[in-house]
UniProtKB/Swiss-Prot annotation:
GO MF entries: DNA-directed RNA polymerase activity; sigma factor activity
Function: This protein is believed to be a positive regulator of late transcription. It may function as a sigma-like component of the host RNA polymerase. Binds to a region of the A3 promoter located between nucleotides -50 and -100 relative to the transcription start site, that presents a sequence-directed curvature. Full induction of this curvature is needed for the transcription activation process.
Cystine pairs: none
A Pfam family recorded for this sequence: Phi-29_GP4
Keyword annotations of the record: Activator, DNA-directed RNA polymerase, Early protein, Nucleotidyltransferase, Sigma factor, Transcription, Transcription regulation, Transferase
Name under which the protein is recorded: Late genes activator
GO cellular component terms, A-Z: DNA-directed RNA polymerase complex
InterPro entries: Phi-29-like_sf (IPR038246), Phi-29_GP4 (IPR008771)
DNA-binding positions: 77-96
Species, as recorded: Bacillus phage Nf (Bacteriophage Nf)
Domain of life of the source: Viruses
Family listed: Belongs to the podoviruses GP4 family.
Upper classification of the organism: Viruses, Duplodnaviria, Heunggongvirae, Uroviricota, Caudoviricetes
Length: 125
């Protein structure tokens, strides 16, 4: 189903509103939600880390887990994500976040054009 007159997609898989950090890619129903995510993820990371540090002082990098949480708070109508060009489930992206906690930093998010199928296949190799 194409985009509505107000620029909203009814199917996340067709959406052109896409952000990526190089490994993970999130899809949004509208440009408003995409902008809300891009404008707020840094602040949410800080707040998320403060909450975790109140409970326990951890050397782990919780940024990706914070970003997934923020995405699910912002995009209320569904969840569609890719990991390295492959469709992924909510559980799989959380496992990925747990694996990246030992990396010293998490890449920032940026808008990207939705990759075509040929480009996705290249990134999977």
């Amino acid at each position: 189903m194409p985009r509505t007159a107000r620029g909203i997609y009814h199917n996340l898989k067709e959406s052109e509103y896409v952000v990526s950090n190089g490994d993970a890619t999130f899809f949004f129903f509208s440009e408003m939600y995409q902008n809300k995510f891009l404008d707020g993820y840094q602040k949410h990371r800080e707040e998320f880390n403060k909450k975790i540090n109140r409970i326990t002082d951890t050397p782990l990098n919780m940024d990706m887990l914070a970003d997934i949480t923020f995405y699910s708070n912002v995009e209320k109508r569904g969840f569609h994500a890719w990991l390295k060009g492959v469709n992924t489930t909510w559980q799989e992206i959380h496992v990925y976040a747990l694996r990246t906690m030992t990396k010293p930093c998490t890449q920032n998010w940026s808008r990207i054009r939705k990759p075509k199928l040929v480009e996705r296949r290249k990134s999977m190799v």
